[in-house]
């Protein structure tokens, strides 16, 4: 979700660095990395967008995210995200998280989490009458130790479609897709999200999102939530991203509190 500068110009277009979506439905069962944001998804939000990094440009994020449930806290401290414009309309993506899991009744664990790999492709440009459209398939590897709550325990695949439209100082993006997850007790599920943001000044953009997951862990049920946040452009290369929110349904089991803060370098 998140701040995204796909060129060396100040961030104005979207509020999402990239993808880190940690969905902690049961800390004792697993910490699920989704796009995203919590979010391994579109920093600083769970919802992502179709806009790739410009050709031969780079984005590097150093970020941390947290999710709190009735079972404890989990997240990243930090995670590194890198995006590269490998071709016109095509972006390569990787996230390497240092994850932590701190259950209410149990030992705090930390270590390598599930590495995320992805390719974003924009196949429709935005015009006055139509939105930008793209796809951003992701693979969540199972590099994290699931027995310690640092990973999912099996590879996940996410197949989303994203749309984006801008009107002056306002911009909105959203969409969703299907998660394929073969981990024990996990269910394949859908994620949908929509975001709206406004350029408050040359340096500051603020926005919010709503999102919904269908059931991810057997017997847990689906969940909905929201985040409020934004990004601040210090200059054309250096950016601060931030968000916080909570669940609206199934709150205690899935999201009593979530937060994201990150530094983004673009060149």
Please describe what each predicted stretch is.
Residues 35-36:
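N-terminal signal peptide c-region/cleavage motif recognized by signal peptidases
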């Amino acid at each position: 979700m998140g701040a995204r500068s796909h060129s060396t110009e100040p961030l104005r277009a979207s509020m999402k660095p990239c993808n880190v979506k940690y969905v902690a439905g049961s800390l004792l069962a697993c910490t699920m990395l989704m796009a995203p944001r919590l979010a391994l998804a579109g920093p600083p939000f769970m919802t992502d967008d179709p806009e790739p990094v410009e050709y031969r440009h780079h984005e590097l994020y150093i970020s941390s995210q947290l999710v709190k449930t009735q079972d404890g806290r989990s997240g990243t401290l930090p995670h590194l995200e890198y995006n590269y414009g490998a071709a016109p309309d095509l972006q390569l993506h990787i996230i390497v998280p240092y994850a932590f899991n701190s259950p209410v009744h149990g030992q705090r664990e930390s270590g390598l989490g599930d590495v995320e790999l992805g390719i974003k492709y924009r196949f429709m440009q935005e015009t006055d009458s139509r939105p930008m459209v793209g796809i951003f398939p992701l693979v969540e590897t199972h590099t994290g130790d699931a027995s310690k709550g640092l990973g999912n325990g099996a590879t996940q695949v996410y197949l989303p479609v994203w749309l984006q439209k801008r009107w002056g100082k306002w911009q909105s993006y959203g969409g969703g897709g299907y998660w394929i997850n073969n981990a024990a007790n996990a269910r394949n599920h859908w994620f949908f999200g929509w975001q709206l943001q406004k350029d408050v000044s040359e340096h500051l953009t603020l926005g919010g999102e709503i999102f919904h997951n269908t059931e991810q862990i057997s017997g847990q049920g689906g969940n909905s939530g929201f985040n409020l946040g934004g990004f601040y452009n210090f200059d054309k290369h250096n950016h601060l991203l931030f968000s916080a929110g909570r669940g609206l349904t199934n709150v205690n089991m899935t999201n009593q509190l979530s937060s994201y803060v990150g530094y983004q370098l673009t060149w």
